[in-house]
Design a protein with these regions (language model features):
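Common nucleic-acid-contacting/processivity interface regions adjacent to the catalytic cores
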Residues: 133-259, 339-399, 417, 426-428, ...
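Catalytic palm subdomain of template-directed nucleic-acid polymerases
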Residues: 423-453
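Alpha-helical interaction scaffolds
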Residues: 1-18, 24-26
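Proline-aspartate-enriched helix->loop->beta-strand connector
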Residues: 21-45
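Catalytic nucleotidyl-transfer cores of nucleotide-processing enzymes
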Residues: 80, 210-375, 491-522
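Active-site-proximal helix-loop-helix substrate-binding element of RNase H-like nuclease domains
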Residues: 4-8, 12, 43, 52, ...
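Active-site palm subdomain of RNA-directed nucleic acid polymerases
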Residues: 124, 393-420
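C-terminal, non-catalytic extensions of nucleic-acid polymerases
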Residues: 449, 453-692
Length: 692
């Protein structure tokens, strides 16, 4: 290898290898180690191997304190051993990715190869010509070395782009916790509060055991107006839960206990709820020195609580970094030089991480408050936050409808959809009543931007001031800003929509950006080949006709028929192999389709004596499944497989491409097309006639 960063140590045997590795480790003992799946593979393997070859005393030298310990944990139904090297923090990059990367929770596969393809457009070194890594090691040692080096390079490149280690370290320093505590929000907030109070010479109360008796009411999500909408504007409440905590001064020491209620509070408390407050049916004029939340709780407003104070400091910091990030994003859009664009993108990532660290801390506060393991857990406080959130979003929905109905002399619902902290406003009627001549899309977007800024935004601010005054808030902190401006939006159900965005938070796009939420193309359970085509098709929906769509689908049918089975199969995670297996019939009645496929795969591997070449599918693993035409050698309608379908199965000709196409592509696309009143194919152009 010609890489200057690589030093090759030639070792005479495994004992020599372990000795040299340990010597190098001790001489350059790391503070943090990372890699892909290091928690469950690399670290246990290193410790177990050094222990077996050299003994426990030598293995313990991996720790600067000569201390290793291990614990059992359950992962996807499997018992796993986690090893801890005292004094060396282990931040597994796969965990950082799942927790903190923008798309970390919705990937089809979490193999390093798959994630590197998604994020970097490059993958691992392929060794398809060999049956296993062992064979690669034995027959092509140089490629085996290059393969391992490439894995490390991919992690370095992922970090260069995503800055997740930087984010984790920022969070840890911010919260004064250990690096590994970035995966535990209650621990982070316990430390944040402890340090905040100690600085003010306030002693933190001892931790008590709490029991969570039941789940509490969550956020409000409106039933959307299903279908196509032109000229959509979305508005977003900035950091809703942290701001609710500030607005209502929600904190353990400001909560008024029932025994301290005065006569006014005793009357109001049992009557308070979201509906009553929306209609302003309660007379709150007699309240003094307290604010009221929709779950009938009162919080003192005579002095700011420690939680709201902490939120305010964090929010100001986040705002500063987010502003710098948006400036860098606009600079990136305007820059033409590719090298300069790369540098600017790194700057965007850095500012994004800094603002994200604050956002994570802010938003995890509410998560911690709802956890029974949190030192300051109180169901009344958690409920006060969620129900105050419901009140805020429904309040503005009612107000904006009243405003637009008065302006346009109508009685319609102009709020297409709303959820926890966002509303989507139909400005189509306003645009058509104001702009009488044909205009370019960007001209209309510019008009919408002006209307939002000069008319709607001030009205929103005024409406929220009215709410704050009514509930006697400590401070008016409901800050709702315009987010996306789109020429078209399609809703199919709650939290399932597509927006063709031309302007987002003031950043003007040269080409529209698709914002897709909850639909099949961004689901990890959709086949990769189908997902890409869905994105293309939806882009076409925004500009083309029904005929264009039908032609696109017809062409893709041809392509689909020739794709490898791995690209068109459904990704899933498998659980319940033991639960659903049956010694007599192989699987029980009611077995989920992908689990059935996994049991059939394992059985067929055994039948063909292939278990030494291909590993059996294990509980909790990611797999893919495909439908099969009958009759076939498997003697069933489905097969699952881990990454690739073994060629020895010899069942390629039995893959049911018709069913795969219908279930993976046509069915989800039809949901969107039905909203537009469009068909997937011209009459007489059926799947049966196409595939013969």
């Amino acid at each position: 290898n010609h890489n200057d960063n690589v030093i090759y140590f030639k070792c005479k045997d495994e004992h020599d290898l372990c000795r040299k590795f340990l010597d190098d480790w001790i001489a350059n003992c790391p503070d943090v180690i990372t890699g892909w799946n290091t928690k469950f593979f690399d670290i246990p393997y290193l410790i177990n191997r050094i222990t077996r070859v050299m003994g426990e005393d030598e293995a313990s030298k991996l720790s600067p304190w000569n201390n290793l310990y291990k614990r059992e944990t359950m992962i996807q139904g499997r018992k796993e051993i986690v090893h801890q090297i005292t004094g060396v923090a282990a931040l597994d990059y796969i965990e950082l990715y799942k927790w903190y990367a923008p798309g970390g929770k919705s990937q089809e596969s979490y193999r390093l190869d798959a994630i590197a393809q998604v994020e970097l457009g490059i993958g691992k070194i392929a060794y398809d010509e060999y049956d296993s890594l062992t064979q690669l090691y034995q027959e092509n040692y140089q490629k085996f070395i290059d393969y391992n080096i490439k894995d490390v390079e991919l992690i370095v490149k992922l970090e260069d782009k995503l800055k997740l280690l930087e984010l984790a370290l920022t969070l840890a320093y911010d919260t004064k916790t250990n690096y590994e505590d970035v995966f535990a929000q209650t621990r982070m907030w316990d430390s944040l509060i402890y340090n905040h109070l100690i600085e003010r010479k306030i002693v933190v109360p001892p931790k008590e055991k709490n029991r969570k008796d039941s789940a509490f009411e969550g956020a409000y999500v409106k039933d959307p107006q299903v279908g196509l909408h032109n000229w959509v504007a979305s508005f977003d409440l900035n950091s809703l839960y942290p701001h609710l905590i500030i607005q209502y001064n929600i904190s353990p020491e400001t909560l008024v206990q029932r025994e301290d209620y005065n006569d006014v509070m005793t009357v109001l408390a049992p009557q308070a709820n979201v509906e009553v407050l929306l209609k302003k049916e309660l007379d709150t004029s007699g309240m003094d020195g307290v604010t009221l939340t929709p779950n009938g709780q009162f919080f003192r407003t005579t002095k700011q609580g420690f939680l709201p104070e902490m939120m305010e400091i964090m929010y100001k910091d986040r705002k500063k970094f987010k502003k710098l990030m948006l400036q860098a994003e606009q600079e990136y859009e305007n820059e033409k030089d590719e090298e300069k664009k790369k540098e600017i993108s790194k700057l965007v990532a850095r500012y994004n991480n800094l603002q994200l660290a604050k956002k994570v801390s802010l938003n995890s506060a509410y998560g911690a408050m709802g956890s029974q393991y949190f030192r300051f857990y109180d169901l009344r406080i958690a409920l006060a936050v969620t129900m105050a959130g419901q009140l805020s979003i429904r309040w503005i929905e009612n107000k904006l409808n009243a405003y637009l109905n008065k302006l346009l002399k109508t009685e319609k619902d102009y709020v297409i959809a709303s959820d926890t902290d966002s509303i989507y406003l139909n400005l189509g009627p306003l645009v058509s009543s104001t702009i009488k001549t044909q205009k370019e899309i960007l001209e209309v977007i510019s008009f919408m931007d002006k209307i939002c800024e000069t008319k709607i935004q001030p009205y929103i601010d005024k409406s929220y001031s009215e709410l704050a005054e009514y509930v006697h808030a400590y401070d008016q902190k409901m800050i709702m800003k315009r987010e996306a401006l789109a020429n078209k939006g399609i809703w199919t159900a709650k939290k399932r929509y597509i927006l063709n965005v031309y302007n987002n938070e003031g950043v003007q796009y040269s080409e529209p950006h698709m914002k897709v939420m909850g639909l099949e193309m961004i689901k990890s359970s959709t086949p990769s080949a189908v997902r890409d085509k869905m994105r293309e098709l939806i882009k076409l929906m925004m500009t083309g006709t029904q005929e264009d769509i039908q032609e696109f689908i017809f062409t893709f049918k041809h392509e689909f028929r020739n794709l490898p089975v791995e690209d068109i199969s459904f990704p899933r995670g498998v659980n319940g192999l033991k639960q659903y297996s049956d010694s007599a019939t192989l699987y029980k009645k009611g077995t989920p389709i992908h689990v059935k496929g996994a049991l059939l795969y394992n059985n067929y591997l055994r039948e063909k004596n292939l278990t030494t070449k291909y590993p059996l599918i294990q509980e909790g693993e990611k797999l893919k499944f495909a439908w099969l035409k009958m009759p076939n050698p498997i003697k069933d309608t489905v097969i699952s497989f881990p990454n690739r379908l073994p060629k020895e199965f010899d069942i390629q000709e039995y893959i049911d491409y018709d069913t795969q196409f219908e279930k993976s592509f046509i069915e989800p696309i039809k949901v969107i097309l039905d909203c537009l009143g469009w068909e997937t194919e011209k009459s007489g152009n059926t799947l049966e006639s196409f595939f013969g």
